[in-house]
Amino acid sequence: MSHLPPAIFLMGPTASGKTDLALELARVLPCELISVDSALVYRGMDIGTAKPAKALLAEFPHRLIDIRDPAESYSAAEFRDDALAAMAEISARGRIPLLVGGTMLYYKALLEGLADMPSADPALRAELEARGAAEGWAALHRELATVDPESAARIHPNDPQRLVRALEVYRVSGLSMTAHRLRQVAQNPLSDRSAGEHLPYTVVHLAIAPTQRQILHERIARRFRLMLEQGFVDEVELLWRRGDLHASLPSMRAVGYRQVWEYLDGLLTREQMVERGIIATRQLAKRQFTWLRNWTDLHWLDSLGDDNLQRTLKYLETAAILA
């Protein structure tokens, strides 16, 4: 058995049932929850992020939820620092960190560390975002392919946040993200390892999703419409009326929030907002699946399984996570 303390990653696409399973595990295991979700960090963004209810958060506290105002940014590097601190504190008390969420870049940052990259340039970022809105993101993707084909191959044309960051790195430094990573590997060969040497834990990797993609699509559509019934538009309108927020902020680029914001701006009808919100959520799920397909040592669970808790506990025992 490894001498490293244990940790559990519970991953999966949006609307797959990650949170429900995590809460079941928290009821029976000596574990504490850490959110791995780039939207749940924001206060006042509850309905559209499917944030656990306040009563559940009181019973089962989640680290890294409600830690930023929507006007602020939150990077993968900040997440890594915060998550490592939370994991160390949980482990020091003899308990198991259970990380749950679908922001796959955050998991990757934890496992592999992050290459040193230039700081953000707000003016340049605003320029690139304006170009993407005017010319279409496919145009920026083609531009990225000319200066950093490796990153372009990894980044989907419908992923504006990563597109903008990759182009920003090149414009600021004159080096592509790929070149930065290669330079870091040359300086420290261990930085290219992907088996978790940067994370001093014995990690069990779990993923949950329906076995049929159509079932996930139906769950996504049903959940988005339920969010609207629960007051999602009113939630976004409170943010929209603040006056200090805008559509280009990372918080307002979150799936669903962008579409409702455009509806409030009069750019979409309600019907268009609903349709585009559902499509954007499906595209997010597709990107999450792409990450997960390339993940190693991943134990899959079926969202519709009626014995996921027992199956997970049995797997954790087999993996020697449970004493």
From Swiss-Prot:
Sequence segments annotated as region (Interaction with substrate tRNA): 37-40, 161-165
Q: Which Gene3D superfamilies match?
A: 1.10.20.140, P-loop containing nucleotide triphosphate hydrolases
Binding-site residues, ATP: 12-19
Which residues take part in binding substrate?
14-19
- Catalytic EC class: transferase
InterPro entries per the UniProt record, alphabetical: Dimethylallyltransferase, IPT, P-loop_NTPase
Example GO molecular function: ATP binding
Q: What is its EC number?
A: 2.5.1.75
- Looking at the UniProt record, the site noted as Interaction with substrate tRNA sits at 103, 125
Q: Which reaction does it catalyse?
A: adenosine(37) in tRNA + dimethylallyl diphosphate = N(6)-dimethylallyladenosine(37) in tRNA + diphosphate
Pfam family, any one:
IPPT
Keywords, ordered alphabetically: ATP-binding, Magnesium, Nucleotide-binding, Transferase, tRNA processing
Transmembrane intervals: none
Keyword presence, Magnesium: yes
**What does the record list as GO biological process?**
tRNA modification
Taxonomic superkingdom? Bacteria
Q: Which cofactor does it need?
A: Mg(2+)
User: Which family is annotated?
Assistant: Belongs to the IPP transferase family.
Record's subunit section: Monomer.
* Function (record text): Catalyzes the transfer of a dimethylallyl group onto the adenine at position 37 in tRNAs that read codons beginning with uridine, leading to the formation of N6-(dimethylallyl)adenosine (i(6)A).
Q: Which HAMAP family match?
A: IPP_trans
Q: What is this protein called?
A: tRNA dimethylallyltransferase
- Gene it is expressed from: miaA
